[in-house]
């Protein structure tokens, strides 16, 4: 599964998150549990189990579901879940601490600290835009945000997901055609803090940013595009949510 806001399990979890934020925890749990039942692969199961764990009323049950989520994540063990492991280990550590199991707590604290907050993702990487650019060009920071009027971005953003870049192109301002470029970072890059460990654990969208230019090394001809209605609903949600951009 490539993470997508249009994925059925992700949609169920998003509904649960909204209920959770409104204090309707039992209803939220029903959506998360339905997501786990309907999940068809380890990535979907990992996401749903993580949210089920948040609604457990006892530490033991929370720990049980965190281990279930972790088991699914370790089966995958790729760029979609590796970024979530430090937080998962810390949550498990906290459970063992509450239960008085210091040896297990120390082990999971050690596992959490063994991860540095740097991306392991080696690409390929993509950038979605409506800009008129060509192979060989450099995409640089300093342009206005597609999501907040008059806000100049200090970083250039990219993703390891082709379809995610396609969605970014669809959401970009302007009347030109949507384009998805294959890009190569020319310097260090980091997890996008606007998306990492926000609604979902880790960086499932494989979204990154850099203060250094991205070199265009190719262009994608086709990618999976959301339907018109889905895109409009998603755009409306972005407009409603607003929120401060971490720049």
Locate the predicted segments by residue.
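Conserved NAD+-utilizing ADP-ribose enzyme module
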Residues: 98, 103-123, 130-133, 146, ...
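Alpha-helical segment of the N-proximal tetratricopeptide repeat
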Residues: 7-30
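Flexible helix-coil transition and linker loops at the boundaries of alpha-helical arrays
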Residues: 1-3, 35-42, 73-83
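Structural signature of alpha-solenoid helical repeat junctions
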Residues: 7-8, 24, 44, 61, ...
């Amino acid at each position: 599964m490539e993470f997508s806001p249009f994925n059925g399990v992700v949609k169920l979890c998003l509904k649960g998150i909204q209920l959770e934020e409104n204090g309707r925890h039992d209803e939220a749990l029903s959506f998360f549990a339905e997501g786990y039942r309907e999940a068809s692969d380890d990535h979907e199961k990992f996401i749903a189990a993580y949210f089920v764990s948040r609604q457990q009323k006892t530490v033991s049950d929370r720990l049980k579901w965190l281990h279930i989520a972790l088991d699914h994540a370790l089966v995958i063990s790729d760029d979609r879940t590796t970024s979530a492991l430090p937080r998962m280990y810390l949550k498990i550590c906290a459970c063992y601490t509450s239960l008085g199991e210091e040896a297990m707590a120390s082990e999971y604290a050690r596992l959490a600290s063994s991860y540095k907050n740097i991306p392991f993702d080696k690409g390929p990487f993509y950038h979605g835009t409506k800009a008129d650019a060509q192979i060989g060009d450099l995409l640089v920071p300093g342009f206005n945000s597609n999501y907040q009027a008059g806000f100049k971005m200090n970083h250039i953003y990219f993703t390891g997901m082709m379809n995610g870049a396609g969605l970014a192109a669809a959401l970009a301002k302007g009347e030109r055609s949507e384009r998805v470029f294959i890009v190569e970072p020319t310097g260090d890059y980091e997890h996008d803090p606007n998306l990492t460990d926000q609604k979902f654990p880790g960086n499932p969208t494989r979204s990154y940013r850099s203060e250094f230019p991205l070199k265009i090394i190719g262009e994608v001809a086709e990618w999976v595009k959301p339907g018109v209605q889905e895109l409009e609903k998603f755009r409306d949600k972005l407009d409603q949510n607003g929120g401060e951009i971490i720049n």
